[in-house]
Amino acid sequence: MHRLVVLSSLLALTFALPQRIRNGNGRNGGGRAQQATAQQQAAQVPQGISTAQDGSTILDDTVMHLHSRESKPKLTPKSNLPIRFKISAPADQFLPASGVPGAAATSAKGTLGANILLHGDGGQSFFDMPNQNVQANTMGVALLAPNANLFWGGGSGLQRTDGVAHAQAVNDFVQNELPARVAVNTSNIVFTGVSGGSLLMSGFFIPAQMQNFANSAVELNCGALAPQVAFQNAATVMPQTRIHYQSTQSDLTELQASIPQAVAAYEQAAVDAGMSAAQINALQTVDNTPAGGHCEFDGQDFVSGVQTMLSSYASVMQGGNGTVQGIGAPSTGVVTKGVVGNEKLKFAAGGRKREAEVENMVNMKWARQAEVFETGDVQLLSCDRTSC
């Protein structure tokens, strides 16, 4: 049994979350002080209605995902998941029940598709919302991980211990809650993963939930895992699912191993589904040409790099010529190289982390911009910048 219950405000989310206790006066200070989790800090960033770069309206709200495998719901902490979301679409495409001024849709069935974005660890791309502009008749949607550290799939690194529950929550939101707020073409749902969000998409969502989204597409930016759960209806999913893997020359060391493993695994799934090499290359593509670090697709920065990929999403994922405007050298701009024959990606030196520097390497620019807390005080490891 799966259902979603609306939270009316941030108060319920903030009140329900535990406080993290840390020593005061620095890491080894003598006093005791409460250090809020990343999720609690995110709850302090106001929700509501704002305007997107292209003039669309952004609705920022939270729902509670209740998940039970039994006929009589018996909630556990892992099944009671707050899903904060952003929907960016023209105001008149929202349903009046959304509370958006100017909402004029009279039916949940619309003409706009939706690009569902899952951010990397720490939530940076949720707050940036690089998919906020309508592109190729597709609205933007971003979901915030229901995890204290804002890690999609929970856990850390390549071990996503809550991947099954989080993938289910994403599916249920798209199937049930999105059409309750905005008119959407449910036959045109595509997905984007960023770093840790890509790990959830490739490791759990595609094999477990993609059977519910016919003729879909998934862009896996700076991260990928081979399927971590049984692949449901792979013979149907693989011939109708577009997958693109985008990395950089100096991506994180662990991702330099896991991305090629994912490429090989999904290619094999396509072979097992009876697809030819030409058919596979038409749907599955990969590139790691840009010289840059983790998610620095423009060769400059994490935030601008992710924006670079999302600004050219339609070109890469929705029938375009595969050109990414502004991608970093030495790329020619075209990133859609078929996976067959390109499984063994060649990388430069990867981004390595030293244990003593883990906390200071975290990058959560949204928090600094909101003047909520300083990066150096965050007690988590961020896939958005230093690890996956």
Region spans (language model):
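A domain-start/cap signature at the N-terminus of enzymes
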Residues: 2-5, 13-113, 278, 325-388
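Active-site glycine-rich loops that stabilize anionic/oxyanionic intermediates
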Residues: 112, 119-123
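Structural cue for short, hydrophobic secondary-structure segments
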Residues: 117-120, 142
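Cap/lid segment of the alpha/beta-hydrolase catalytic domain
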Residues: 134, 142-168
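Alpha/beta-hydrolase active-site loop
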Residues: 157-186
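Gly/Ala-rich beta-loop-alpha elbow adjacent to hydrolase catalytic centers
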Residues: 192-201
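Conserved hydrolase catalytic core segment
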Residues: 203-216
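The feature captures the conserved acid-bearing segment of alpha/beta-hydrolase catalytic domains
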Residues: 213-319
